[in-house]
Amino acid sequence: MTTAEEKPIEEKKSLSFVEQMIEADLAEGKNGGRIQTRFPPEPNGYLHIGHAKAICMDFGVAEKYNGVCNIRFDDTNPTKENNEYVENILNDISWLGFKWGNIYYASDYFDQLWEFAVWMIKNGHAYIDEQTAEQIAEQKGTPTTPGVASPYRDRPIEESLELFNKMNTPESVEGSMVLRAKLDMANPNMHFRDPIIYRIIHTPHHRTGTKWNAYPMYDFAHGQSDYFEGVTHSICTLEFVPHRPLYDKFIDFLKEMRGETENIHDFRPRQIEFNRLNLTYTMMSKRKLLALVNEGFVSGWDDPRMPTISGMRRRGYSPESIRNFIDSIGYTKFDALNEMALLESAVRDDLNKRALRVSAVLDPVKLVITNYPEGQTEEMEAVNNPENEADGTHTITFSKNLWIEREDFMEEASKKFFRMTVGKEVRLKNAYIVKCTGCTKDENGNIIEIQAEYDPISKSGMEGANRKVKGTLHWVSADHCHMAQVRVYDRLFTVADLGADEREYHELLNPESLKTIDNCYVENYAAERKPGEYLQFQRIGYFMADPDSTADHLVFNKTVGLKDTWAKKNK
C-alpha cells in the first residue's frame, strides 16, 4: 500500500533486442562510449511507412542514448535519383518529428571509394571482368554448389588498373566491364562470390554531374561510408543479414589499407538487423509504387491511398499516430504481416485526442423546423474537443432550415431505430430537441424534405434539455454552410497478403479504393480549416482538408472512420 506522498511506480518498458545490444556495447566501452547511427535512404522515391519504422529505430536509439543520427543519401545510382526525392525525404523525416545531426551523401566519398578500389586491385583483392552480366550470374553457382571462377580472375594487376581507369571515361561502354572483388567463389554465402563493386553508368549524377562514369555498388559504398562517418551501429532490415559478412570484410580491407590491423575489431560500425514492416493490403516496393504513379493508377506519390509518408500526411494521419503504431508492433528478428487495422486504430486513438469536432452532412436531406420563427437564427456553442478543454469552443448557426444525413431518417422504423422517425423525438446536437411531424416526397417516392417541431425550452443548457431522448443527430444550417467534396478511401489492394499472390500487382488493385462524394455540406467553422488541421466530422469519422481545396471548392479527405468497419465488412 502506498502513502499519499509516494509516487506510483511506472511500468518500465522492456528493451528491444537492438537496445539490449547497444547497452551491451556501451557497458563494454566500445567506440569510446559513443552512439552514432544513420538513416541511409536512396533518393529514388518517396519514403513509405516501412521506412518510418527504420527512422524510428535509427533516430530513437540515438536520442535515447545521447548519441546522434545522421542522414546519408545512398546516391550511387544516378539513373534513378534526383533532388526532388532528396527534398521530400528530408521533409518527411522532419514531419515525423526527428532531428538529424548532419546530412551526408555517398557521393561525398566517391574519391575515397575510388582510392580504396585502386588499393584493392593493387593488393590482389579486385579485378576487371569483361564478361556479360548473364555470364557472371551463371558462374555464381547455387548455395549448394560452388561458383566457377571468371577467366579474368587472375588477370595482371596492371591490366586491371588500366581498365579500371578506362571505366571512368566517357568513351567506356556500359556493361562492357565491371570491377569485382576477389573473394571466394566457393563460399556458401553467395554474396561472397566475387561481388561486383563498380559498374559503368553514363547518366549525369544529380550532385556530381559528369565527373564520374563508374559508380560503386551499394555493398561496396555502404559499409565504407559508415566507417568514414564514424557510425557505431548500422541498423538495417533482415534482408541484409547475408550481406553482413561482406560488410565486415570490406571494412577489414579498409582498415588494412589504413594500417589499422592491430585494432581491426575496434572502432568500427556494427551491423544489426531487425524485421521490416509488412502491412496487409499494402505494397511496400518503391519500384512498384513508382509504377502505380507513372501508370496513373494513383494521382501521385502523395495520393492518400499510398503507404507513403506524404500520402498518409495528406490523408490526415498524424506523425504521432505513425510513431505510436510502430512502437506498438516493436522490433524482432522475425518477419510478420501486420494488420492494417492496427495502424488505423493507432490513428483513430491519436486523432480522438487532437481532432476538432465539426458538423458535416455527406448525404443531405432538408429538415424544416416548422414552428421556428422565419428568418431567425441562433448561435449555438459547440465544444471543439471534449478530450482537450484548452481547444475551446466555436459557434454554429441554427435556423429554420437544416441539413441532416438521409440515413438518419426512416418514415417507418423499428423500435431499435433511435434516430429521426415520424412521431418520435431526437436531440439536435448543441441545439434543441425536435419531434418529427412528417415528410415530403417527390413523384418517384423519394423523400425530399422532413418536417419537425422544436421544443423552445429544450436548448442545450436549459432545464428542458435534461429529459431523456435516445437519439442525437448532427446537422448544419442550410443557409449557413458551405458545399464540399468529400473523398472516401478504401484499401488500395483487394488482397491482404500481396507477397503470397502470384498475380500481377495491377490485377489486385481495388477499383473502389476512391469514392468521391459531391454536394456535401459543412458548417462554416469547418470550411475555414486548412490542410494540416485534424477534424472529426461528428458521428462519421476523421477528416482533413486536402491541398486541392479552395475557398470556392472545398475538398476533404476521410482519414479513418470512428470504428473499424472493414473488419465487419469482411466477416
Report the location of each language-model feature:
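N-terminal catalytic cores of NTP/NDP-binding nucleotidyl/phosphoryl-transfer enzymes
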Residues: 13-90, 205-237
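Conserved short loop/turn motifs at secondary-structure junctions
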Residues: 40-43, 72-80, 102-111, 134, ...
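Substrate/cofactor-recognition hotspot
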Residues: 325-571
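Residue-level signal for inorganic ion chemistry
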Residues: 29, 58, 89, 120, ...
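A glycine-rich helix N-cap at a beta->alpha junction
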Residues: 85-111, 116-119, 124-127
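Active-site cores that bind ATP or allylic diphosphates and position pyrophosphate for catalysis
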Residues: 71, 75-77, 83-84, 105, ...
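N-terminal acidic, proline/glycine-rich, low-complexity intrinsically disordered segments
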Residues: 1-7
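Long, charged, mostly alpha-helical binding arms that flank functional sites
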Residues: 266-346
